Amino acid sequence: MVHTPYHSDFVTVCWFLYLIRTADNRLYTGITTDVPRRFRQHQAGKGAKALRGKGDLQLAFSHEVGEHSLALRLEYRVKQLTKREKERLVAGEDAFETLLARLKDD
């Protein structure tokens, strides 16, 4: 599914959180305004250094977050999760909306 990087009602940029799975089954977490573009950059080796030379990459998860400041806080929080917790997020076992709501309340 391709997400549009802009809300239809506003000219405000919408941010997304994404997780990429590497060939060795690690999960990389990032944020962007355009998930397909950013994923192509990672695949071409022009994204994060952490993903260069890691073999085939798969987009494991992406979700609309909203504002940049919230996306940054969410990215930090997800990076602190254990591998098991990230896998549960990817599998949909942990409600992303719950995590997002907790951050909005902070």
Curated annotation (Swiss-Prot):
Domain GIY-YIG, residue spans: 13-88
A Pfam match: GIY-YIG
InterPro entries attached to this UniProt entry: GIY-YIG_endonuc, GIY-YIG_endonuc_sf, UPF0213_domain, UPF0213_GIY-YIG_endonuc
Listed transmembrane segments: none
PROSITE patterns from the UniProt entry: GIY_YIG
Coiled-coil intervals: none
HAMAP family xrefs: UPF0213
Family: Belongs to the UPF0213 family.
PANTHER family: UPF0213 PROTEIN YHBQ
Protein name: UPF0213 protein KPN78578_35340
Organism per entry: Klebsiella pneumoniae subsp. pneumoniae (strain ATCC 700721 / MGH 78578)
Organism ancestry: Bacteria, Pseudomonadati, Pseudomonadota, Gammaproteobacteria, Enterobacterales
